Amino acid sequence: MQLQLDLYNSTRHPGNDADTMQTIKMVTEQNDRLNKMVKTLLDMSELQTVGRDEVIAVDALVDEVLADLEPLAQEKNIKLIGKCKDITLRGSDILIYRMVYNLVENAIKYNHLDGQVTVTAYQEENQVHLSVEDTGSGIPEELKERVFEPFFRVDKSRSRELGGVGLGLALVREIVRVHDGSITVKSNPSGGTIFEVVL
């Protein structure tokens, strides 16, 4: 289907009016969203088969995530800050990367212009605490547990604008679960939301 859309788009027939091109754009967006959904569902179905015995340098992993998401943050002039201690974590490098990536990406998307996203990690006894804090509008108290439900969106009116398929946080929760950890969401006293993972 994507090949057909690309081919149709590339021809740019003179007869294509604005409405037609808008329809093509919408169909392309929906196709991209469907592809992302299928990939995420496949990722979720394979979580149990991924090895989780790698030694992960948390600070290096967080730095990599922030570097990868810097272009997205720049679109909204959002400052990304890493405050991670020199600690290690045993688990799946690829899954922990995806967990942090999804949390930071979500924090950027739902943040305000000129906002800030801070990733903090430290060790307490035998557990690693990792939090992602943003300066956005926050999440209503009654919806905080629902954000981990597949396809749930706090602000449905912005689903097209923000992209995605509503599976990012559901995948995060599953990654935390297979690592025998916990995840909580709470309000930031200075505004915004804090997701805290304990592994």
Regions from the PLM with identified roles:
Residues 114-126:
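Short beta-strand/loop element within the Bergerat-fold HATPase_c
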Residues 47-54, 84, 88-94:
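Conserved micro-motifs of the catalytic ATP-binding
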Residues 26-34:
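Short alpha-helical segment of the dimerization/phosphotransfer core of two-component systems
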